[in-house]
Amino acid sequence: MNKIVSKEHFSANVVKLEVEAPLIARSRKAGHFVIVKVGEKGERIPLTIAGADTTKGTITLVIQAVGGSSKKICELNAGDYITDLVGPLGQATHIEKVGTVVCAGGGVGVAPLLPIVEAFHKAGNRVIVVLAARTKELVILEEQMRANSDEVIVMTDDGSYGTKGLVTNGVESVINREKVDLCVTIGPAVVMKFVSALTKKYEIPTVASLNTIMVDGTGMCGACRITVGGKTKFVCVDGPEFDAHQVDFDEMLMRLGAYKDIEKK
């Protein structure tokens, strides 16, 4: 079992948990994720690691309360324990110096984007971050992003903060003013779908970090399978990052919606 060291509310249904996991903290890299379970009969939920402190032996997770299991995690407090925490899983982000990198995050996807932003910036890239949220209250980790990038562009659906518009508007504004060598996108599948469609038009290599339904995290169950370039891939072992222009997002969206009625219970 893993103890929760601290808890912070980003909004009414989004929390940040700092969890004791010294082995994971030492070995994790940008892009890695863990699978979390609360209670012996709880659902196994994949969560990308948003940060780690090797000195304290902790990792940071950001969770949005959507279904029953994620709500249970969000209800935990400092001092409580997570029943199972497995990781680090998946393939780490390929980090190299490529030039200008645009990192686009929507919603809670901003959290796992942070270590990727940090890694690309440390590698000597010019990193521009586009943060998107519905309203000002839902914008998270802006300060941390500014500390680890060259520029941060904030987009809100209602214009209550930053610039009114969608994440794609922010990304395109950068493309229109300077050469972009790589785009990394994380967030809801529909957000990544439209970011991918935009960058494909401009022939900009793009990586999408996918968060699909998972059970075992080893590729055995096949719950996380997706189609990439016409071939079946498993997000838990082959990903979570893929060439966004090759991902069948429509299929992914259909699979993600398969259990929505059950998740509401």
Regions found by a protein language model. Give the residues of each.
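Ferredoxin-reductase
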Residues: 1-80
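Structural signal for conserved beta-strand scaffold positions within catalytic alpha/beta enzyme cores
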Residues: 6, 51, 154-156, 208, ...
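A generic structural signal for residues embedded in beta-strands
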Residues: 36, 84-85, 226
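Short, surface-exposed secondary-structure boundary micro-motifs
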Residues: 39, 87-88, 229
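Short, Lys/Arg- and Gly-enriched loop/turn segments at beta-strand edges
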Residues: 42-50, 89-99, 236
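FNR/FR-type flavoprotein reductase catalytic core
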Residues: 71-215
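Local cysteine-cluster metal-coordination motifs and their immediate loop/turn environment
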Residues: 112, 189, 211-241
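Short Fe-S-cluster ligation motifs
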Residues: 234-238, 242-265
